[in-house]
């Protein structure tokens, strides 16, 4: 830690402060970043901010992104996925029952707000053969009140967030999840740039480990971290909102079953194939440099080291025998 000497870095969040980013607040509050030699700025996002651009341009060393990182990679933006927080993406469509929306196909002709960067929701429509141009697209206000007031019929949302206010308003609503169409994507992926990883591999490793340690703490102490968020980062919502968000996140993160941060090449392959199947990625898209899999690489390095040692001994034995 001392060798890193409190290096300043920025983590660009993908949205406003909330329990959605609890692990990073916990890592800061518990001193995990400090112990890793890092001084971390947690930068809140605003609507329309391109998180990938912030990271690739070097304005931020790290970011939180969607599965659209794969599409960014195809576009030539050299992003590297470091860890997955949500094993199941929280992105859904929420529709007013009063707007006569009974199935996903009823979105045709309805007033729909879809947020930027929600590629999997667009993929959901394509999978269901619903042309996006047949929706009455409305710019997203990011206010569930617009759905409550009937200004729109459908909104894209995080299943862990907006329903808090819809329930409080006693609104009858339906939730449509891409998982019903076989689109079971990751959510809120921690990432960096190839440039950052290439120049500062130890810093990347230290930041990742401290962040995931923070996430484990946050999921074990949700009340404490919800109170921290409300007191230090954002009082935009009542404390009960952050506690609600924490509860809703448990089945999406699955900390009881899966190590926080875990991601598999096979699952990313499935995501890439899903995008390819609907024309959002080319078939056979090579994303090998997109994944940061330190545990697997460590095992491969150990195997190679063992193989080299074995071969060296073998050669030495052959030389010895030949000299006899």
Residue spans of the language-model regions?
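Alpha-to-beta junction loops
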Residues: 38-41, 55-65, 77-79, 110-113, ...
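Secondary-structure end/capping motifs
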Residues: 199-278
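N-terminal hydrophobic or amphipathic helices and topogenic motifs
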Residues: 1-41, 250-324
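Pocket-lining segment of extracytoplasmic ligand-binding domains
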Residues: 68, 124, 140-235
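Solvent-exposed, polar/charged alpha-helical surfaces in well-ordered, non-transmembrane soluble domains
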Residues: 22, 31, 53, 57, ...
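Bilobed "Venus flytrap"/periplasmic-binding protein-like clamshell domains
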Residues: 6-30, 89-169, 182-187, 269
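Beta->alpha turn/N-cap motifs
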Residues: 44-48, 58-70, 75, 85-86, ...
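Short beta-strand-to-loop elements that line the ligand-binding cleft
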Residues: 39-47, 61-62, 132-142, 175-178
